[in-house]
C-alpha cells in the first residue's frame, strides 16, 4: 500500500486574464473611421466630436482624422475628439 501524506489546501494559485485596456491611439496620430482609440472600464475618457462610445465604454473614431485629447469643464473631464483634415 502506498503511503503518501495528503497534500494541504491553498487559497492562492489563480489569476484573471489580461484585459488589454488603455489608450490605443495617442494625440496627433491619424485614425480612420472605426479605429479604436481608448479601451476602458467606465468613462475615464469621454467621447467628443467624431468619436463614438461602445457598450463597454470603448471609444472609437466615427470619421477619418487626427486624434486630440482635451480637458474641459468644471470637473476636469477628459475628452477625446477626432479633427477631420
UniProtKB/Swiss-Prot annotation:
Keyword Ribosomal protein: yes
Keyword Glycoprotein in record: no
GO cellular component terms, semicolon-separated: cytosolic large ribosomal subunit
GO biological process, one term: translation
GO molecular function: structural constituent of ribosome
Positions of region (Disordered): 1-20
Keywords, sorted A to Z: Ribonucleoprotein, Ribosomal protein
UniProt-listed Pfam families: Ribosomal_L27
Family statement drawn from the similarity comment of this UniProt entry: Belongs to the bacterial ribosomal protein bL27 family.
PANTHER family: LARGE RIBOSOMAL SUBUNIT PROTEIN BL27M, RIBOSOMAL PROTEIN L27
Protein name: Large ribosomal subunit protein bL27
Gene: rpmA
Amino acid at each position: 500500500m502506498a503511503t503518501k501524506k495528503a497534500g494541504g489546501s491553498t487559497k492562492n494559485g489563480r489569476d484573471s486574464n489580461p484585459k488589454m485596456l488603455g489608450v490605443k491611439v495617442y494625440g496627433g496620430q491619424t485614425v480612420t473611421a472605426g479605429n479604436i482609440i481608448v479601451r476602458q472600464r467606465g468613462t475615464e475618457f469621454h467621447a467628443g466630436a467624431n468619436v463614438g462610445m461602445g457598450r463597454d465604454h470603448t471609444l472609437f473614431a466615427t470619421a477619418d482624422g487626427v486624434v486630440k485629447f482635451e480637458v474641459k469643464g468644471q470637473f476636469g473631464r477628459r475628452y477625446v475628439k477626432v479633427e477631420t483634415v
